[in-house]
């Protein structure tokens, strides 16, 4: 996967966030302050603008990290900050490389997962985006370790991401604004989890071209 293919992945993420922003708003209104759709729109616009032109660098790591910086400037909300951190950590993992293979992508996903957990100061099981990203990263890395190609690993990543979202849906939110409404969040899809699935679906779709 070279920088042109990474650019395609970023554009797919931007389109997916824009397409799902109303759904994310609805989910967030049920258990938060209802602004996640606005954040998704800002992230989509920032990523679209960033990837609108041909990449100015061949270095995949730098290109991904700079995309994270663009998100951070445009959407400094909780989710925006977490996703910006994820991209910057992922990019740092492969800085200096003009292409990435399945093993590199596994390292990038793991770095993104660790970055989100450190920045968010929480871990799996608290009904946050981590409950999507963490199992997704583990599933991708596990598949690659078994010799799977990128497309197969991406499929397993998506299965784990969706299962992670669904597993915590019955739970009560314990982190962030959603925790303020307590038991009302039980049985509701966490908007951060849904956003994580949307993003990973877009990334996975781009691997079909590799």
Task: List PLM regions with ranges.
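N-terminal loops that bind phosphate or other acidic moieties
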Residues: 1-210
């Amino acid at each position: 996967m070279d920088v042109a293919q990474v650019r395609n992945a970023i554009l797919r993420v931007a389109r997916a966030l824009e397409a799902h922003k109303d759904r994310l708003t609805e989910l967030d209104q049920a258990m938060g302050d209802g602004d996640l759709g606005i954040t998704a729109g800002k992230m989509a616009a920032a990523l679209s603008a960033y990837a609108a032109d041909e990449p100015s660098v061949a270095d995949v790591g730098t290109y991904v990290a700079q995309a994270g910086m663009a998100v951070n400037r445009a959407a400094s909300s909780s989710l925006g900050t977490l996703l910006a951190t994820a991209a910057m950590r992922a990019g740092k993992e492969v800085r200096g490389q003009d292409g990435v293979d399945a093993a590199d992508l596994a390292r990038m996903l793991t770095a993104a997962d660790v970055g989100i957990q450190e920045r968010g100061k929480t871990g799996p099981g608290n009904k946050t985006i981590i409950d999507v990203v963490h199992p997704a990263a583990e599933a991708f890395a596990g598949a690659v370790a078994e010799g799977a190609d990128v497309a197969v690993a991406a499929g397993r990543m998506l299965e784990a991401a969706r299962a992670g979202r669904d597993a915590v849906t019955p739970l009560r939110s314990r982190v962030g604004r959603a925790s303020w409404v307590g038991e009302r969040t039980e049985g509701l899809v966490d908007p951060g989890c849904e956003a994580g699935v949307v993003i990973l679906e877009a990334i996975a779709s781009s691997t079909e071209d590799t």
